[in-house]
Amino acid sequence: GTLLLGSTRLSDYDHAFPFKDGTMNQSSGLLFARGQKNISITGFGTIDGQGGDKAFQFGNDADGGPKRPKIIYFVECCDIVVTDVTLRNSAYWVQHYEKCEDVTIRGLKVFSHCNYNNDGLDIDAKNATISDCYIDVEDDAICFKSDHPEFCENITVTNCVTASNCNAIKFGTASHGGYRNIAVSNCVVRRAAEDNIRHWSKQLEHISADVTVISGVAIEM
């Protein structure tokens, strides 16, 4: 498949804009869209953000994380389909769907352990399905966001394998609008393949291997 490499020049990423609710966006993305519809990224190619390059070494989020580009960043878009691609080596979050509607994410392979805040999938959306994905990342694997007054709602996550040095599945930290009608089922939580940045990876504590606390979720001890 085709290999698409992200630029390592920060000057190529400049998407600052205000939201209607008064907040200011400072993030950018290799693949960026705002206010668009009928977007598809499909096929079996690889998108590599080259996020380990020295141009993106600013430290963690508090020290300028949003200056680093994401690989996919869609804002206020609808009818989005992202299937079967491989996403690697993001400088920041791998993919972020903010204030989006009608999103289908299926069959992705996500691997990113090259920088701080390497979340695998951050979704702040309505009416979304996420399925059959393999996500192995340094920070949160799948993270639900609610960064604006609207609910993050009507989302299903199923048949995914997540591996993370932080949180496999997380709600927040941005939790302004809240969450509603979100289902996570038949997922596997594994240890991350690498632990390059914060060295958070360790055995789960106070959990017995013979205790299942969430139906349909397997945890590798």
Task: Locate each region found by the language model.
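Extracellular/periplasmic carbohydrate-active domains that bind, remodel
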Residues: 1-221
